Amino acid sequence: MKNIKLIEVPSEIGAGTRGASLGVEAIKIAALDFMSNFFVHFPSEKIEVENKILFEPIQSPYAKRMQGVLTMYDRVSKAVCDSMKSHFFPVVISGDHSTAGGTIAGIKMAKPKSKLGVIWIDAHADLHTPYTTPSGNMHGMPLAASIAEDNKESKVHELDEKTAKQWDQLKSLGKIHQKVLPEDVVFISLRDFE
């Protein structure tokens, strides 16, 4: 475990409710309560977040704060990729889980020829897209972005050109369109799609 690198991402722009950004610090405080030196022992990188856009008008009701999520995917993916190329095992601790797509992208960027598998431990599949989402919250879409799925055959929304373009950018982050194949995803504790 000596090669672990912590990547802290106190972001909450993909969630529908506020407070997820406090999770990283809450985990660190809980570790202190259990007298764990985990957060002191390993090197750490804190990713700059875009939480300020929470105070701006939503541009697309079907992909809320998409530009900020795209920025976060880019930052997280580069941090994960750089960590792996420096022979670290990245442990990403985030607020909302929209950044999971950036984590998966970063692993694929570091190992572009490797086949990835994902164990998705969540109550929700996070396979919605801007075409199918009931909420527009981006935390319901990271796995769909990672497998490059639009699910247009089940669409309930027509996207404007800007939203469709940003969704395509999210899916092809790192110039790799499909980071993981659908058959290489395993779900644990799933009860719903979003």
Language model features with spans:
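Conserved alpha-helical scaffold segments that buttress catalytic/binding sites
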Residues: K2-E194
